[in-house]
């Protein structure tokens, strides 16, 4: 399994419903999302880059907003949860992208600041 991180820029404060997690305010600034793909990492990343998709994962709801853009993508061989734990940032939404987390990360989305 390969993992990846998306460096995300939120260009204005947004109020957004994230699936069953609920409604949240995403403040302007930079975020990092850590994810993984069992089979085809490139297809997963390609899906994240598309604005036309069925909203399935928590990250889909954020990336689908016009005020949000992916700034950088980093691929890694490090296990998703270990990579996430090594990443600085503030957890703002508990459970975001971490429903299958094995290391109790709390969230796979971290706020890096403005």
Which residues does each predicted region cover?
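Short, conserved loop/helix-junction motifs that constitute active-site signature segments
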Residues: 24
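Non-catalytic terminal regions with compositionally biased, polar/charged low complexity
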Residues: 27-28
């Amino acid at each position: 399994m390969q993992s990846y991180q998306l460096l995300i820029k939120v260009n204005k404060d947004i109020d957004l419903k994230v699936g069953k997690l609920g409604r949240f305010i995403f403040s302007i600034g930079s975020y990092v999302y850590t994810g993984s793909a069992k089979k085809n990492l490139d297809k997963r990343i390609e899906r994240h880059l598309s604005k036309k998709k069925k909203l399935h994962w928590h990250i889909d709801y954020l990336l689908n907003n016009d005020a949000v853009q992916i700034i950088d993508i980093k691929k890694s061989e490090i296990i998703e949860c270990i990579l996430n734990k090594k990443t600085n940032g503030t957890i703002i939404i508990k459970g975001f992208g971490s429903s299958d987390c094995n290391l109790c990360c709390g969230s796979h989305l971290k706020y890096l600041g403005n």
